[in-house]
Amino acid sequence: MTAVLLGAALTLLALPAATARIGRRLRPSEWARFCAVALAAGALLLEIGLLAWAAPTLLRAVGVPSLASACDRLLSLLTVGGEGLGWAAAVSATILPLVAAVTAGRLRAGRRSVARELWLGEGRTIAGQLVVVLPIDRPLAISFADPEPTIVVSTGLLEALEPHEVEAVVRHEVAHLVHRHQPLLCLVALITAAFGWLPPVRSSAGALHLALERWADEVAAGTCPVERLVVRDALLHLAIVEEAPLGMAAFSPAETVSSRMAALEAPPSPPSLMKHALLYLPGTGASLVAIPALLAWTTQANAVLAMAGRCPV
């Protein structure tokens, strides 16, 4: 059962990377939600699977399992790979939440650090929005929603772009705030920190990041060909822009620029109805397999716990 849970989890985590060719042809908002659900569900299911794998080993270690044959039979249904792999699963199940917690702490600290420096800048209205302009020579455009919605640009960015391009950049950052992208950007950071050593999962996190940036591009540019070229030109001028602090939205992270420029120049044609439906089949299948496995494991685990008091120690 645990092998099924782990298999379904890894399938979901790798799904955005595996289906990116079709997914990029969807509306960026739909593709971003698809990626986010797959990554969040996969990470949660993986943690549950590791805990399920480790549970028999941990129960034996604390003296709960007995030597009675009935208990042994039940425990054998739960145990996969022996004590060694059980302890490895226990360690992994502990490390992953710790990595996530540390990364989440870094995200909060990064946002608060930037917020503390805002007094150095001046407020200015750009594209109808209040923007903080920091005296930094390097081009910079970021936004974050916590502790309060804020858009920050640098004097270097104002000097590097034409006024209408600056307005496009600000509209892009407004889109991130209005559509609540910060939690999803944090999810990208958490998945990358915890699973970035797995290339397919790292690619899936990158797919979500690109989808969020394209989503904001589409809101900023709309359907007007001229405005789409304005956003594209701003990206072109800032193609080697800074990296934003973790969990914040930057206008032009380098790894997303080329794909975004191509989409702005020539929006991809939507996939056929058949391909659109097929995109959702793997994730649906993984979920339909994982849910019965999780229910079966829970039933077996409850049986073990119920019998623990009657089994000889």
Kindly give the residue locations of the regions a language model identified.
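Membrane-anchoring/interfacial helices and their immediately flanking loops
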Residues: M1-A43
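Cytosolic-facing loops and C-terminal tails of multi-pass membrane proteins
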Residues: T2-A17, G82-S113, V230, H237-V313
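Cytoplasmic membrane-interface segments at the C-terminal ends of transmembrane helices
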Residues: P16-W31, P56, L98-T125, C224, ...
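Hydrophobic membrane-embedded segments
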Residues: E47-L96, L305-P312
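Peri-catalytic and regulatory segments of divalent metal-dependent proteins
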Residues: A88-V174, H179
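Catalytic Zn2+-binding segment of zinc metalloproteases
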Residues: V174-A193
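Acidic/histidine metal-binding catalytic segments
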Residues: L187-V188, V226-L236
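An active-site-proximal "capping" alpha-helix that borders the catalytic cofactor pocket
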Residues: L210-C224
